[in-house]
Design a protein with these regions (language model features):
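Iron-associated oxidoreductase/ferritin-like identity signal
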Residues: 1-142
Length: 142
């Protein structure tokens, strides 16, 4: 089954969101580096790399399914926070938002009756559960 236009558009929006997330985490890494918090900066860099991996997974799957995948311009990300805890609060809220986006993408796959895409997206659903848990666990330490 070839990707429908609706699925192609939804995947392209998610790719854009994943790339924005990578930029957000890179910005957070810079913030922590400037504060001398190397461990936090390292964690954020790893998160940024992971977001790019997510974008690439979406691109590869979309291309395989005949979708016209593209890289869209992304908006600027924040660069300052009041304190380190505020950064991790932002991380948690952002990961909850990404979970909603993935759920919406799954809804499109269900509406388009594309079972292969639903199966593919289950990995992302499970990944978001882990991402929210990790962010909450860090916040709980503050």
């Amino acid at each position: 089954m070839k990707f429908t236009k609706r699925l192609t558009d939804a995947f392209n929006e998610q790719i854009k969101a994943e790339m924005w997330s990578a930029n957000l985490y890179s910005s957070m890494a810079i913030y922590f580096q400037s504060m001398g918090l190397a461990g936090c900066a390292h964690w954020m860099k790893k998160q940024a790399e992971e977001e790019l991996e997510h974008a690439n997974k979406l691109i590869e799957f979309g291309v395989t399914r005949g979708g016209e995948m593209k890289i869209s311009p992304i908006d600027a990300v924040p660069g300052t926070w009041a304190e380190p805890k505020a950064v991790f609060e932002h991380v948690y809220k952002h990961e909850c938002h990404v979970s909603e986006l993935i759920d919406n993408l799954m809804d499109v796959a269900i509406a388009e009756n594309d079972k292969a895409t639903q199966e593919f997206l289950r990995w992302f659903v499970n990944e978001q559960v882990e991402e929210e848990e990790n962010a909450q666990a860090i916040l709980d330490k503050f």
